[in-house]
């Protein structure tokens, strides 16, 4: 659900500053800390069974990158992402990424903001395919080059998401993730 009202901004602030900032963040870890989001920044809250369980923010194409820089974002950027710990490993991050990609169907390229928390680099436990497919297991790893004859190919996020969309192991459908209920044109992207 796109954040539009004052009440939704309050929910976003509580998720960001209180739940993540105080309750779920280990201050001894190198976890990321999110600053309060500008009213000008686009955000969506992830709802599950009536509770706000996460959010993501987007930097819009053409917006200034920062005060005094004069540089603008050249494409929409998937910026801040937060999912409450008790909802991890349920496919909600993938559902948010899919929603972000489907929000900008007219754009050929989309961006993902750096830096990422250590948790974002963890592969799903017990699934060696995730490690080899993404070729990274930690933020310090460099992407692995496929061996000759490996049969691997570079994939765009939309292609990979289409493959996992109907996968029963994906863990969550858009409706269960709280991203359904939006106009169908914003949730579906026609295949080429």
UniProtKB/Swiss-Prot annotation:
This is Protein FAM169BP. Belongs to the FAM169 family. Residues 121-192 are annotated as: Disordered. The gene is FAM169BP. The lineage of its organism: Eukaryota, Metazoa, Chordata, Craniata, Vertebrata. Residues 159-177 have a biased composition (Acidic residues). InterPro entries: FAM169 (IPR029625).
